[in-house]
């Protein structure tokens, strides 16, 4: 059976984000629905747009570095923010799990699941 990995990424039952230096370089439809934004509104943006504020973005960014350095995987439950749509700026609880592709530079590239 041939596997279409792009289709699997796009249709995954959880939100998926590919990041590079804490910027969104790819996301699936589920993330777009969760955050109330079109893909072209998210790709190219700092992940900061998904957080309720700059302080929370910085706090979580600093907190996950030693954990990703140690084991390459990080998970938590956190408050995130809708980007656009009729619920713009509404906050919601989200379970986030991520894996870095480089433990020595954890923000360099990663994949993140949002549930």
Short names for language-model regions:
Residues 19, 86-91, 95-111:
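Short loop/turn elements at sensory-signaling interfaces that couple input to output
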Residues 114-115:
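PAS-associated C-terminal
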Residues 25-27, 33, 51, 74, 81-83, 87-92:
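PAS-family sensory domains
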Residues 41-55:
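PAS-family sensory/regulatory domains
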Residues 31-43:
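PAS/PAS-like sensory domain cap-loop motif
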């Amino acid at each position: 059976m041939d596997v279409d990995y792009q289709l699997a990424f796009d249709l995954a039952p959880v939100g998926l984000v590919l990041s590079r230096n804490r910027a969104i370089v790819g996301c699936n439809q589920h993330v777009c629905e969760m955050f109330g934004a079109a893909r072209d509104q998210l790709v190219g943006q700092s992940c900061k747009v998904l957080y309720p504020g700059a302080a929370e973005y910085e706090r979580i960014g600093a907190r996950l570095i030693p954990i990703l350095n140690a084991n390459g995987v990080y998970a938590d439950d956190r408050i995130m923010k809708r980007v656009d749509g009729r619920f713009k700026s509404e906050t919601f609880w989200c379970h986030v799990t991520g894996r870095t592709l480089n433990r020595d530079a954890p923000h360099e590239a990663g994949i993140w699941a949002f549930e």
